[in-house]
Amino acid sequence: MTLFRLTTCASFLFLAACKDAALAPCLIQRPPLGGYTMKFTLPGAAPAGCENLMPPIFGDNWRIDGYSDHQIYMKSDLMHYPQDGGDPDPSHSVLGKGILPDEPTNGICTIPDVTEMRSDTDPLGTGQAEFAYHAHGMNFLSGARYQGSEFEAKVDVTIGSCTATYSVQALTPTQIGGTCVTDADCDPFADPAAGRPLGSGINPDYAVACTMEDWVTTYLTGDPTVGICFFTKPFPGLK
């Protein structure tokens, strides 16, 4: 039995219709949308002695899926499976697991805690092999109009012997690899006359723009001339 039920009012990729529909169950958006693109921000300074290891801001993409009994599994694109060149240590799991509630509270569905994801492969190029995530307080924006298409969270990031708690904001459909060069590319609706046969797929309620900040071009696009469509406001990031 799956946790994920499409509503009959879904007419766009971002499922952004039917404002007046009955209370929707807790949902997350599954891997076919490419996962959630995430901005990790370190509030304040890094722990003493960790300034050169913990980036102030960085980006990643997590694939999230759900199974029976409200179980939610997630995996970072930075962490490869052992058979794909990842960490061969069987005691280190690249999969995190949490529990999604049945119904939202005040429009939010919260996964309180996620098991550690770890891959000792230095994915950020810091020179330190140990790398781990421990997410907690994952708050998904719920309701028939949003259906878990964004979340905020706190994530304990471990690099080498250093650990710091980052604030995270995340958006789906994925923006990995780059999706824009101008703000017009972030329009959720297609405009064939302007050379955009497809829209961005992002919920039209979200305040987004094309950003080419360093955390984007360094960690997500690899190109200073290509950006991603991302929030311009803190969670819930609505217009």
Question: Residue ranges of each PLM-predicted region?
Answer:
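Bacterial N-terminal signal peptides that target proteins for export
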Residues: M1-T7
